[in-house]
Amino acid sequence: MMKYIPKKIIFGFLISLILFTKIDAQYLKRSGKDIVNDQGEKIILRAMGIGNWMLQEPYMINAVGAYSGQWEFKEKIETLIGEERTENFYENWLNNFVIKEDIDSLSSWGFNSVRLALHYNLFTLPIEEEPVNGENTWLTKGFELIDNVVSWCESNEIYVILDLHAAPGGQGRDSNISDRNPSKPNLW
């Protein structure tokens, strides 16, 4: 178990490094009680959280009690329609849930930032599925989705906040928002 901790820590650290990111490398930071840009100008974030896209959260689709997390929802879909159709469903979900026109609309409504709730399984395999014990297998899907959103946000001068909402092992006991599977090792 201890040899897997570095993977979790490294992945969390990498996501933390790019928490407040704008594609032209304009980072935000804290200055006293304010958030400021690279020039020290105070920034008031008017953000929209884009949840339920890269991480399905039961409370967001009125399914609390029907399933405890995305992992269980996916299992139920597979039981109904099979693995291949489930993968097709998720591919369509990810490719169509947020599109450029959505980001354009957010900008026109006055938003200057979006927060993406991320699931680790779009970036790397679960520990138990790694082909080489202790190695990282990087998946491209999550990076492609982020690249698209960052590109759309750049053209609209919108900041992107990356939130690793579902870390490997799930953080905390609230599987409703972290996709924690109690049958697997927990982050904490």
Predicted regions and their residues:
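Bacterial Sec-dependent N-terminal signal peptides
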Residues: 1-25
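Generic marker of residues within folded, mature protein domains
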Residues: 15, 38, 104-106
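N-terminal module-boundary/linker segments of secreted carbohydrate-active enzymes
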Residues: 25-47, 58
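Active-site mouth of glycoside hydrolases
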Residues: 42-45, 50-188
